[in-house]
Structures are given as structure tokens and as C-alpha cells.
């Protein structure tokens, strides 16, 4: 299974919030946001900070998706 942060990006769009604002409010780095943009894993501490800043549960910012391998 792979991680997807598409829910987070949609939430930011719905709230008309820029990534820079999230970085400031959650106290996370631009590097972390870049990793999330590539659907790479980040620590639960980071996810907790984002959830706290947005006042949402973790399921509202990420999901696990099937990891398809090409043959």
C-alpha cells in the first residue's frame, strides 16, 4: 500500500489556503510539504501537526491506496 495526500491538497483548495500558510500554521518545513507532494511518507508527528492546524482527523488529509507494480 502507498500513501496519498490528495485529500490534503483538496482540503487546502476548498479552504482557499496556500501551502505556505499551512507550513506556518502547522510549524512544518517546506521540505516536508515537498515530500508530501511526492506522496512520500512523513512522520506521525508531522501529520499530527497538520491535523491540529486544520482541525481535522488524519483520515481527512491522507489515505492508503493500492501500490501497483508494473510487470
Where are these regions (language model features)?
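Short, charged recognition helix plus adjacent turn
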Residues: 2, 10-11, 15, 35, ...
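Short basic helix-loop element that most often maps to the first helix and adjoining turn
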Residues: 6-25
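Conserved hydrophobic/aromatic packing and binding residues within compact polymer-binding modules
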Residues: 22, 33, 61
